């Protein structure tokens, strides 16, 4: 793959079927829940990417048998009821936020052992302190670098009690604590210090815990007190655990017809979904796309002869992984796009708000930045720009979709993506799938 990678525009309306990879969020949660359970669980339709490989390798280092079959998209985990067999381990979490937070809490469950965890430089800047404080309040012994990675855990199990947690910077901090709480020595109550956490991902975690045998958690009406179940062992969710297609990855291909006109079909993306990002389809319907979901999958269409899609003003807090998708295609929308509720994305793989503003301005757009929002006023797109990706997979994929617009009208590339292999974090085959969609669309016209 060349770097920068020129994006070849579509010269015909999109007409293609794209098979999405499995959900990263579900795959990594399911691997941990399978390890917490007794017996073997096989994930069907699992994601194979850097983030899931990191989780699988970490579980192996902790003594679990993990068998991967990428050709069949299956991952088998032989659980042990949460017992960590290794007396010590060094775990590398890369830039995988799910693995980083979930494994930290998991290692604290062990009655004894020493576990060292570290990641790449970007991971060393991502929020961890609130989770570490909560785990220490439950009896964990953790050495950290001022509340950040690297970490050393001297395991001695977790006791019960009430802890405070700020999950506004990342709901993964709360999800990590929820999944291990049933195996603490006493009941755990979690008091949230701020209601502004992403409840959709927490709901996913709680629903998956129920699928693996836990009773429902008790949640106060204001959402600020969560009491996970206690005393019930996890059990396998069945011989096969189906993993949904990734709804965040779907956002790129759902947006493609808005850029190129035409129709994209996404088999297997059907409701109801565990993933909050499935709601991105509703946003596309509001800009003028036709989105239909059946038990077989989801189809998104935008008429070639229709006027430009309409801009949107909306709060993306609940589906913030998809805000980059809308922002990247906003130059092609009619009117001013305003996206709010995204302050927490400043502490993800990069400062996603400032980085998005910078790249749109390089493309000639009028962009206003606020602490929690951006406003995009379309201007003529500037050609021959190589998009910086900031080590962030979602920048590569979002702007890859914008590059499918035939800006010059002759099918020649006008936009390139620097470091396109960053997509390996969650969707290694993204650019291959995008190019195949272009070829299929050309052939069917």
For the regions a protein language model found, what residue spans apply to each?
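Short, structured segments at the rim of ligand-binding sites
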Residues: 1-445
């Amino acid at each position: 793959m060349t770097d920068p990678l020129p994006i070849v525009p579509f010269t015909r309306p999109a007409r293609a079927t794209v098979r999405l990879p499995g959900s990263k969020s579900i795959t990594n949660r399911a691997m941990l829940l399978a390890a917490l359970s007794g017996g073997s669980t096989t994930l069907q339709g699992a994601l194979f990417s850097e983030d899931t490989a990191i989780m699988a390798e970490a579980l192996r280092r902790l003594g679990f048998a993990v068998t991967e079959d990428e050709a069949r998209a299956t991952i088998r985990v032989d659980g042990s009821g949460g017992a960590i067999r290794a007396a010590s381990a060094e775990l590398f979490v890369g830039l995988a936020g799910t693995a980083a937070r979930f494994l930290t809490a998991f290692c604290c469950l062990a009655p004894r052992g020493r576990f060292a965890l570290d990641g790449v430089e970007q991971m060393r800047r991502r929020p961890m302190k609130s989770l570490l404080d909560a785990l220490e309040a439950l009896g964990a012994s953790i050495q950290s670098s001022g509340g950040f990675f690297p970490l050393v855990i001297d395991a001695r199990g977790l006791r019960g009690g009430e802890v405070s947690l700020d999950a506004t910077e990342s709901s993964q901090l709360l999800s990590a604590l929820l999944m291990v709480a049933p195996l603490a020595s006493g009941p755990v109550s979690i008091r949230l210090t701020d209601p502004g956490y992403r409840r959709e991902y927490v709901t996913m975690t709680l629903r998956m815990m129920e699928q693996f045998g836990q009773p429902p958690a008790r949640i106060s009406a204001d959402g600020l007190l969560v009491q996970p179940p206690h005393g019930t062992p996890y059990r396998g969710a069945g011989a096969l655990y189906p993993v949904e297609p990734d709804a965040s990855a779907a956002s790129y291909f759902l947006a493609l017809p808005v850029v190129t006109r035409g129709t994209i079909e996404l088999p297997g993306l059907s409701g109801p979904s565990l993933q909050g990002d499935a709601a991105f389809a509703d946003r596309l319907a509001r800009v003028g796309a036709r989105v239909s979901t059946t038990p077989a999958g989801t189809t998104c269409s935008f008429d070639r002869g229709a006027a430009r899609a309409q801009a949107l003003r909306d709060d993306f807090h609940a589906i913030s992984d998809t805000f980059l998708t809308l922002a990247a295609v906003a130059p092609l929308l009619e009117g001013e796009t305003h996206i709010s509720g995204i302050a927490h994305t400043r502490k993800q793989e990069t400062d996603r708000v400032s980085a998005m503003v910078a790249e749109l301005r390089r493309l000639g757009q009028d962009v206003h930045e606020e602490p929690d929002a951006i406003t995009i006023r379309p201007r003529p797109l500037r050609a021959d720009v190589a998009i910086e990706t900031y080590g962030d997979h979602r920048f590569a994929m979002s702007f890859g979709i914008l590059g499918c617009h035939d800006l010059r009208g002759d099918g020649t590339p006008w936009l390139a993506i620097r470091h396109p292999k960053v997509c390996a974090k969650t969707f290694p085959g993204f650019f291959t799938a995008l190019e195949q969609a272009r070829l299929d669309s050309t052939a069917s016209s």
